[in-house]
A protein has these predicted regions:
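Alpha-helical metal-binding/catalytic segments enriched in His/Glu/Asp
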Residues: 61-62
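Extended beta-strand/beta-hairpin segments
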Residues: 1-56, 67-147
Length: 147
């Protein structure tokens, strides 16, 4: 590891509560109930699934990265929304299921006169999202930036 490189650690806890349901949490944060998605036995559409959490983690990490780059460059973000769809499929090489693609559509509004600069920061936001950097899935993001 290079000298001066930061290392971050994140601790979580999981407790099985029966069937195919568990509670996950982290110190000082509310618990989430997690079940399989509707495609699998034991699903409960009222709860998050690991697959939905993975997709949402890419969305939220991309947003936080974009907001950080905008803040560092004096761009005021007025609004930000995104939609994402994750594609889980069997891989050809090892026949295991994995996310192979996540497609996101981001719609953001920035303060007047900064749309061009904000558009230029989108590639940095994608590059610097820690979750994107940690997956082998292709992450495709379509940005709609307006003033």
């Amino acid at each position: 590891m290079p000298l001066g490189s930061k290392v971050f650690q994140y601790q979580t806890e999981l407790e099985w509560v029966g069937g195919r349901e568990c509670r996950v949490g982290a110190p000082g944060r509310p618990d989430l109930t997690v079940t399989p998605p509707e495609d699998f036995p034991g699903a409960n559409a009222m709860h998050w699934s690991p697959e939905h959490l993975f997709t949402a983690s890419l969305q939220s990490c991309t947003m936080l990265s974009f907001l950080a780059h905008c803040a560092h460059n004096g761009v005021e973000v007025v609004s930000y929304q995104s939609e994402a769809a994750g594609e889980l499929a069997r891989r050809e090489d090892d026949r295991r299921y994995a996310f192979r693609r996540v497609a996101m559509i981001v719609t953001a509004t920035v303060a007047g006169g900064h749309a061009h600069l904000a558009q230029g920061l989108t590639a940095k936001a994608e590059r610097d999202c820690f979750i994107s950097a940690s997956t082998t899935a292709t992450v495709e993001t379509a940005w709609r930036i307006s003033e």
